[in-house]
Amino acid sequence: MGKEEKNNIEDKALDNEQEMDQESTSKAVEELSIEEQLERARDTIKELEETCDSFKDEALRARAEMENVRKRAERDVSNARKFGIEKFAKELLPVIDSIEQALKHEVKLEEAIAMKEGIELTSKMLVDTLKKNGLEELDPKGEKFDPNLHEAMAMIPNSEFEDNTIFDVFQKGYMLNGRVVRAAKVVIVKN
């Protein structure tokens, strides 16, 4: 083998070695770029999952808010139905009081007695009508005093009754569907 041939073989071997180095470097670059691409894809998936979770959370919150609005509207409608006549009921209370005051007076003439019976029937009809619409009378004589239902107008000593017992009622109270429209004005026992 000549020197020239030997140099050619060495050059070819060197070229082959360089090609192999380039191929492995190229493969490493390709593998690195595939790894990078995979990492980027994972990051994108993670971002999309977070966005999806965020939208799910917003949808759940919106649904809950809509449910709360619906319940609030139902409650408002129910209260409007129950307490819509409250002002009307309050305005009728003095009428009931006047009729009851008229009925307390003794009448001696026969015509007046018939008139009193008519007023009694009218009063009963009015009270029955109001009861049908949720108005309840509070006549708490003999009951324990409750500041939520009663208004103390006076206190008297009386050893026959316990303290805070309602001895007398100045003016009846009224409730509309369980809500106090007017507290009963009462005299309570205080020993």
Curated annotation (Swiss-Prot):
GO terms for biological process: protein folding. It comes from the Bacteria. Gene3D superfamilies: 3.90.20.20, Head domain of nucleotide exchange factor GrpE. It is found in: Cytoplasm. Residues 1-15 have a biased composition (Basic and acidic residues). GO terms for cellular component: cytosol. Residues 1-35 are annotated as: Disordered. GO terms for molecular function: adenyl-nucleotide exchange factor activity; protein homodimerization activity; protein-folding chaperone binding; unfolded protein binding. Keywords: Chaperone, Cytoplasm, Stress response. Belongs to the GrpE family. Homodimer. Participates actively in the response to hyperosmotic and heat shock by preventing the aggregation of stress-denatured proteins, in association with DnaK and GrpE. It is the nucleotide exchange factor for DnaK and may function as a thermosensor. Unfolded proteins bind initially to DnaJ; upon interaction with the DnaJ-bound protein, DnaK hydrolyzes its bound ATP, resulting in the formation of a stable complex. GrpE releases ADP from DnaK; ATP binding to DnaK triggers the release of the substrate protein, thus completing the reaction cycle. This is Protein GrpE. The gene is grpE.
